[in-house]
Regions:
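Extracytoplasmic thiol/disulfide redox context detector
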Residues: 2-123, 178, 184-200, 222, ...
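Cysteine-centric redox/oxidoreductase cores and disulfide-bonded domains
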Residues: 119-201, 205-230
Length: 230
């Protein structure tokens, strides 16, 4: 129990907090009393520890992470501030986050949103991801991205409809898909997600933060502001 409290104080109050714990008679019953009176300390401490561990994973893969598949970018392709999103077209939470991303782009003209196609929810997710990269190859990624989410669950019909809406050259797209052109990039995205501890969608990286789930515009805007200040 004592080491948990030491960890909590160290994480939440810095090393000074841990030192205070170590050099004052704050053990035994005092520790128990403190934790009983402040039950939120341990979950918060573990949350901070988890975030720090994930932050440490970002730097070794940052260049790879922020490098988009050519054309698979929303917002400003030359932007100096990068938001990375791991997404799956079968993910309702990803669909619900589309307006949040558009709002962020409108408010941050230097924001580059790098989309990492991360198909994990159903086999058709992979088909949609391949078509999305084919759209990127033809300079029509944003149009396909929006159309695919608007059409709902990916299947052969909705994927084809989204591709038509985006104006893809279907013969060219299918040829690239059949050749396996995009599969190495999808595998790389899965490897990146694993390295960062991302197991679901949407997953976000901005600055030194890894954020899980559909957290909403306000939380993402806050993370962008923090990245801008760092």
């Amino acid at each position: 129990m004592r080491w948990y409290a030491t960890l909590a104080l160290s994480l939440l109050g810095g090393f000074a907090g841990a030192a205070l714990f170590s050099f004052t008679p704050f053990g035994g019953e005092a520790t128990r009393s403190y934790l009983m009176a402040n039950p939120e300390v341990l979950p918060r401490a573990m949350e901070v520890l988890n975030q720090r561990e994930r932050q440490a994973r970002i730097d070794p893969v940052r260049d790879q992470l922020e490098l988009a598949f050519p054309g698979a970018v929303l917002g400003n392709p030359e932007g100096t501030l990068t938001l990375v999103e791991f997404t799956d077209y079968a993910c309702g939470y990803c669909r619900g986050s589309v307006p949040d991303v558009k709002k962020l782009i409108a408010a941050n003209h230097d924001l580059k949103v790098v989309i990492k196609e991360f198909p994990i929810l159903r086999p058709e997710s992979t088909d949609a991801a391949r078509m999305a990269l084919a759209a990127a190859q033809q300079g029509k990624y944003a149009a396909f991205h929006d159309a695919m989410f608007e059409l709902g669950t990916p299947n052969a019909d909705t994927i084809a409809a989204a591709a038509r809406t985006a104006g893809l050259d279907m013969a060219r797209a299918q040829k690239a898909i059949d050749a396996g052109t995009f599969d190495p990039f999808l595998r790389e995205n899965h490897e990146l997600a694993s390295a960062l501890g991302i197991g679901g969608t949407p997953g976000w990286i901005v600055g030194d933060q890894v954020i899980d789930g559909a957290v909403g515009h306000e939380r993402l805007a806050e993370a962008i502001a923090e990245a801008r200040e760092s």
